[in-house]
Design a protein with these regions (language model features):
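Active-site-adjacent core segments of small-molecule enzymes
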Residues: 1-324
Length: 324
């Protein structure tokens, strides 16, 4: 059973969740459709140029259809009548040649800046100021056809943040580093060890490696050897240009607690919301938090909202009191 008690108990002990909880409980938490929502890489990635210079990068996909959201009451009604509403909307738009698109932009942070930034660049609960590091437009992603075979092209797809091309690398973000392994591991369990050979997942360029055998293998490299190092010249060799860049490490290794400012960015978001969206935010929080029976949890969460913005906390407290 889903438990508001457990959800808010966890959040009230995790102030780093405040920014995301504010997004989730606002109108932004329920997009009108997949076409009307932004997308983000969330993690920080690393770019390395031909000269070996390192930059940190954040990816942003901004919808070209504009942001549109649903109020919770209407969303509940739609979910009851058609739980596949979002999938149908996307399918029908593409079928009608109203191809949805997103502008891909990046924020680029020089390596030296990352060493002195006030907010840690590798905390997925924080954003990077677009005033200090403005978005640089890269291109456009357009969805221009629907899957012809849903199983082959959707259910068997294996996206992974660990699929890099030379010049793009993982950052020290610990959550990202965990995902680098977890996604591939899940794919091997779900689709198989040779899922990368399926048409939807296979590379567009020639692949040279020593992988052989395994379940569902259909291109096994004939009698080629499957080990390295070896004495043969015509076998795949490591590309020195694709090696991971070096980086500096200093200090003592250990597990450290850190006191981050979890309130400033949540306050900026709260102040950005129009009055109607603030009202929806307060009502959505009160409807959920008001179900909690443990008053200590409610008090602890309201205290966090108050530390974000006194008005925020006061309005949530008043809304819960009115519905009691």
């Amino acid at each position: 059973m889903k438990s508001p008690e457990a959800v808010w108990d966890f959040w009230s002990h995790s102030p780093e969740s405040l920014h995301q909880v504010t997004i989730l409980m606002s109108d932004r938490g329920i997009p009108l459709s997949f076409r009307h929502m932004h997308g983000f890489g969330s993690h920080t990635f690393k770019w390395v140029n031909a000269a070996g210079e390192v930059f940190f990068v954040k990816y942003h996909f901004k919808t070209n259809q504009g942001i549109k959201n649903l109020e919770s009451q209407l969303a509940e009604e739609i979910a009851g009548k058609n739980p596949d509403f979002h999938i149908e909307d996307l399918h029908n738009a593409i079928e009608n040649q109203e191809f949805p698109s997103w502008t891909l932009s990046v924020q680029i942070i020089p390596y030296a800046d990352a060493l002195t930034m006030k907010e840690t660049l590798f905390d997925v609960t924080k954003t990077v100021s677009q005033k200090e590091y403005p978005l640089i437009e890269v291109g456009t992603m357009t969805l221009n056809r629907n899957p012809e075979n849903y199983f082959a092209e959707v259910e068997q797809v294996t996206f992974s943040p660990g699929n890099f091309v030379p010049g793009i690398e993982a950052s020290p973000d610990k959550l990202l580093q965990g995902r680098l392994f977890a996604y591939g591991d899940a794919h091997r369990h779900r689709v198989g060890a040779n899922s990368h050979q399926l048409p939807i997942n296979q590379a567009k360029a020639p692949v040279n490696n020593y992988q052989k055998d395994g379940n569902m293998r259909f291109n096994n490299g004939n009698s080629e050897i499957n080990y390295e190092p070896n004495s043969y010249t015509e076998t795949p060799k490591e590309d020195p240009t694709a090696k991971i860049s070096s980086f500096e490490v200093e200090g003592n290794v250990g597990n450290y607690s850190y006191n981050q400012d979890h309130f400033t960015q949540a306050n900026a978001l709260y102040n950005l919301l129009p009055s109607e969206e603030k009202e929806n935010l307060i009502n959505n929080i009160a409807a959920s938090l008001g179900q909690v029976k443990n008053q200590e949890i409610i008090a602890r969460q309201i205290d966090l909202f108050t530390r974000v913005n006194p008005e925020y906390g006061a309005r949530v407290a008043q809304a819960i009191k009115q519905q009691a």
